[in-house]
Design a protein with these regions (language model features):
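Small/polar-rich, solvent-exposed N-terminal microdomains that initiate assembly or binding
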Residues: 1-76
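Short regulatory "switch" loops immediately downstream of catalytic or recognition motifs
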Residues: 25-29, 90-95
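Oligomerization/assembly interface segments of phage tail-like spikes and tubes
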Residues: 78-93, 114
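Short histidine-centered catalytic/ligand-binding loop motif
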Residues: 94-106
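Acidic-leaning, charged glycine-interspersed low-complexity segments
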Residues: 27-28, 57-60, 105-137
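Generic short beta-strand segments
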Residues: 68-71, 89-91, 134
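Short conserved micro-motifs at the rims of enzyme active sites and ligand-binding pockets
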Residues: 77-78, 98
Length: 137
């Protein structure tokens, strides 16, 4: 008996988390640039592979979280319409982010880097990903 199709979602989550942890820019934006092994610190502390928005951010915390939605094409037994939702949140005291003398919104810098990492690339092995929306909720 083979493995269930749902195991692919687990693999996709791991690939996305790996990309976040391997991005020097995201590592820097999460405040882990001086860490020897950010891949051991970021998952489940600064990035959650599920929809997670903390109730109250009491410290100057920053989070890059994500969720996956996928529909199964039962005729071909493959996932189609795979959607990755990123939830980028931070404490209000760190929204303003200064880089090389220029002020940005922290979450705008994160969004740009996520776009650089994932757009028009086949990271998950299911075809190229595309930015569909950049609308906050």
């Amino acid at each position: 008996m083979g493995k269930a199709r749902s195991y692919e979602i687990i693999e996709y989550r791991k690939k996305i988390m790996d990309e976040i942890c391997q991005s020097q820019e995201l590592v820097k934006l999460l405040g882990c640039a001086n860490e020897k092994h950010p891949e051991d610190i970021i998952p489940y502390k600064w990035s959650f592979p599920h929809e997670y928005i903390p109730d109250t951010i009491a410290e100057t915390d920053k989070f890059i979280n994500f969720e996956i939605s996928a529909a199964l094409d039962t005729r071909n037994n493959v996932y189609k319409d795979l959607t990755i939702y990123f939830f980028v949140v931070c404490h209000e005291d760190v929204i303003r982010y200064k880089d090389k003398g220029i002020n940005y919104l922290w979450y705008d810098k994160v969004t740009c880097e996520l776009d650089n990492i994932f757009s028009e690339k086949n990271i998950l092995g299911v075809g190229k990903t595309y930015l569909v929306s950049n609308v906050p909720y």
